[in-house]
Design a protein with these regions (language model features):
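Alpha-helical scaffold elements adjacent to nucleotide-binding pockets in ATP/GTP-utilizing enzyme cores
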Residues: 100, 137, 162, 166, ...
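Hydrophobic positions on the alpha1 helix immediately C-terminal to the Walker A/P-loop
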Residues: 69
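Hydrophobic anchor at the beta1->P-loop junction of P-loop NTPases
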Residues: 56-58
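Nucleotide-state-sensitive switch-loop elements of NTP-binding domains
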Residues: 5-53, 64, 73-159, 166-169, ...
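Long, well-ordered amphipathic alpha-helical subdomains in the mid-to-C-terminal portions
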Residues: 21-23, 236, 247-314
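Conserved phosphate/pyrophosphate-binding and hydrolysis machinery centered on Walker-type P-loop NTPases
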Residues: 14, 28, 32-36, 63, ...
Length: 314
């Protein structure tokens, strides 16, 4: 990727040019040192322009209909005058390190909506399945004037924890009768969820969905109270039939009013910023260590000694 002057990117972002925004995000995601230097300058410039959006994490097991929901939800939001950015984290092959990056094809309306910006990003081997630079991408999207940032996760492993640590509201999508094998994933993310939506509540599945709503609502009472003092909602929706979408937004608005009034919203944002500072610091320290003179060769020697049982791995 051939780079340009800093002002090209910063002026483009402030002018809400999506092509230049995409180019800037590509620089942020790049592992090349020259790109990283320029990307940091772009982020530093955009930092004062960021922080004014609502960041919403959306997760759920594969097959729950996340992309269909985001298509319906995003269309509703732009319909009431909001500008939204969708950061869709795609599953990545651990062997080929390739990515499907198919979210734009699954969000036909949003892909051509002038008030929506979709940025697929490979999850790679990053802890949690969330693109390593997702937090910086959020800042750039905010600087470009997007009022609502939707972060969709791969819905497996530790990805929910990562998204929870960079968003204001955490939305869990579920479907009725998903099977007992998913209970482990459900419990872990249910404790973080600010709202649970039972998707695909339509047709013959409506009765099952209502039963699931009762079960999840009962289960939530068993969890400790949230620090925000917010009581999570459990509601039904059908992204396919466009029902329950406006209600989902009303829940989020109620959450924002409550947490901004109590001061929790600002407190949580500052805590997230501090956490990400230390994550970045740890990453930089490790990177510097592995790039040190002769480190790779020394590690290989030590590794072989460990494998031979000559020294302890601890």
């Amino acid at each position: 990727m051939k780079t340009k002057e800093l002002s090209y990117y910063t002026n483009g972002i402030e002018a809400k040019n999506t092509v230049i925004l995409s180019q800037s995000i590509t620089l942020v995601e790049s592992s090349k040192k020259e790109h990283q230097v320029l990307a940091q300058q772009i982020i530093n410039h955009c930092l004062p322009l960021s922080g004014n959006s609502i960041r919403i994490g959306i997760t759920g097991v594969p097959g729950v209909g996340k992309s269909t929901f985001i298509e319906a939800f995003g269309t509703f939001l732009t319909g009431i005058g909001k500008k939204i950015a969708v950061l869709a984290i795609d599953p990545t092959s651990q062997q080929s390190r390739g990515s499907i990056l198919g979210d734009k094809t699954r969000m036909d309306n949003l892909a051509v909506n002038p008030d929506a910006y979709i940025r697929p990003s490979a999850s790679g081997k990053t802890l949690g399945g969330v693109g390593q630079k997702t937090h910086e991408t959020i800042l750039l999207c905010e600087a470009a004037g997007y009022e609502i940032i939707l972060v969709e996760t791969v819905g497996v492993g530790q990805s929910e924890t990562e998204v929870f640590s960079m968003t204001d509201f955490f939305l869990l999508l579920m479907i009725a009768g998903a099977g007992d094998e998913l209970q482990g994933i459900k419990r872990g993310i249910m404790e973080m969820a600010d709202a649970i939506l039972i998707n695909k509540a339509e047709g013959d599945n409506l009765i099952k969905a209502k039963q699931a709503r009762r079960e999840y609502a009962n289960a939530l009472h068993l969890f400790p109270a949230k620090e925000s003092d917010w009581i999570p909602h459990v509601e039904l929706c059908s992204a396919l039939q466009n029902t329950g979408i406006e209600e989902a937004w009303n829940i989020i608005e109620s959450y924002l009013v409550k947490t901004k009034t109590t001061g929790y919203f600002e407190k949580n944002r500052k805590r997230q910023t501090k956490d990400w500072f230390y994550k970045f610091l740890n990453h930089q320290v490790l990177t510097s260590f592995y790039e040190g003179n002769g480190i790779t060769e020394q590690l290989k020697e030590i590794e072989q000694q460990v494998l031979n049982g000559e020294i302890s791995p601890f």
